Curated annotation (Swiss-Prot):
Keyword Protein transport applies: no
Organism annotation: Salmonella arizonae (strain ATCC BAA-731 / CDC346-86 / RSK2980)
GO aspect biological process, one term: L-leucine biosynthetic process
Homology family: Belongs to the LeuD family. LeuD type 1 subfamily.
Phosphoprotein in keyword set: no
Protein name (record): 3-isopropylmalate dehydratase small subunit
Highest taxon listed in the record's lineage: Bacteria
Coiled coil: none
Amino acid sequence: MAEKFIQHTGLVVPLDAANVDTDAIIPKQFLQKVTRTGFGAHLFNDWRFLDEQGQQPNPAFVLNFPEYQGASILLARENFGCGSSREHAPWALTDYGFKVVIAPSFADIFYGNSFNNQLLPVKLSEEAVDELFALAQANPGIHFEVDLAAQVVKAGDKRYPFEIDAFRRHCMMNGLDSIGLTLQHEDAIAAYENKQPAFMR
């Protein structure tokens, strides 16, 4: 059972870049592992570090700024998560500590993979995202509240409603991944299997 997502208040980091692809999120050389942990160390590796080994932080990259350490909400531009399909991208984001990504648009496969991994992708209009960038950049260290139950982002004194598929919202709020969804029908599955002839079990 995955962690339930009802509401989250967290530090916001503004990544002012459009078309951030999955190879930028987690470069291909770090995809060998099949567990979901450990990828956060390599998140945005080519941007966060000056060396391939990830030992020399790039002081010019926003995630390395002291005021954004511990950020759990990523603010980005349009078409976030484009490029090749890799579930490692949301793995890296969640392992780093992100709970929410806010952007005007997402690549379709990344969008779906995010829900499967309890990372909430919030789509807002470009105008709303522009306002949030201005607010976050003028107030380093600001926290936003993302209320999935009410489907609203609260930032400063403004509220930004967002739309989300009802089924995906239900799964996020109840901590249901694909396994959890199946287990909701465990009794029915067991009853069906018990009706089958012994040679089919």
